[in-house]
Swiss-Prot record:
Quaternary structure annotation from Swiss-Prot or TrEMBL: The mammalian APC/C is composed at least of 14 distinct subunits ANAPC1, ANAPC2, CDC27/APC3, ANAPC4, ANAPC5, CDC16/APC6, ANAPC7, CDC23/APC8, ANAPC10, ANAPC11, CDC26/APC12, ANAPC13, ANAPC15 and ANAPC16 that assemble into a complex of at least 19 chains with a combined molecular mass of around 1.2 MDa; APC/C interacts with FZR1 and FBXO5.
UniProt protein name: Anaphase-promoting complex subunit 13
Lineage, opening ranks: Eukaryota, Metazoa, Chordata, Craniata, Vertebrata
Any one of the GO BP annotations: anaphase-promoting complex-dependent catabolic process
Pathway annotation: Protein modification; protein ubiquitination
Highest taxon, organism lineage: Eukaryota
Entry similarity comment: Belongs to the APC13 family.
Subcellular location: Nucleus
Keyword entries, A-Z: Cell cycle, Cell division, Mitosis, Nucleus, Ubl conjugation pathway
Keyword Iron-sulfur part of the UniProt annotation: no
InterPro entries the record matches: Apc13
PANTHER family: ANAPHASE-PROMOTING COMPLEX SUBUNIT 13
GO CC list: anaphase-promoting complex
Region Disordered, annotated ranges: 33-56
Amino acid sequence: MDSEVQRDGRILDLIDDAWREDKLPYEDVAIPLSELPEPEQDNGGTTESVKEQEMKWTDLALQGLHENVPPAGN
C-alpha cells in the first residue's frame, strides 16, 4: 500500500556504529574567507561574516521619504 513505509534493508548494512561516530577533524573543514567574521572586531563584536555585511541593506533612503511627503491639509 502507498500509506505504508517501505524500508530498503541494504542501506542498514552500510551504516554501523564506527561510521556513525566518525567525525571530520576540525582542521579539515574548509571555510571560505568571505564566510568568516572579521578577525579584528573593534565595533562591538559583530559576528556577521564579510559576505553578510556586504549584503546588509544600510541605505534607508530617509531623505527621499522626507522629500516626497505630501503637503498637509485639503
